[in-house]
Amino acid sequence: FWGNLRAKEEIIMKAVVQRVSHAHVDIDGVTVGAIEKGFLVLLGVWSGDSEGDCRQLAEKVGNLRVFEDENGKLNKALADVQGAVLVVPNFTIAGDCRKGNRPSFIKAERPERAVPLFELFKQTLAERGIPVQSGVFGADMQVSLVNDGPITLIVEKGDNSF
């Protein structure tokens, strides 16, 4: 019980979302995921994250209105523009650089818990009808993208957010 308590306003799960005109992820020179218009999402899973946190973050990302409407306002979501998502697992997002020059990754979730949450994030987006591609958890990946805008957002699921 006590291990699940979190400090007030503590960040739980985080996604770095970049609006892209296209993006792909390669492993050993082979493309394993690619999209055209949509989002490249670098997903960080924190120790103690829950399925509920994951679903809420995926819903938030899927509903982001950062595509231009006919008046040039950022008013359209992925579904409105037939966009896709390329999700790349990235434990380094949980890195803490406050002390010293070497990041601490102690807050990153262990792979045996993080992988199912990564898969749930993708599944939640797909259930909304959003095409999803992904990188591979634990792999050494090369990610290429053209950031459109540029628009880059950090979407965080904390105890008191959304």
Where do the model's predicted regions map?
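A short beta-strand-loop-alpha-helix capping motif that often carries His-Thr
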Residues: 75-92, 138-148
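Flexible glycine-/small-residue-rich
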Residues: 19, 45, 89-90, 145-147, ...
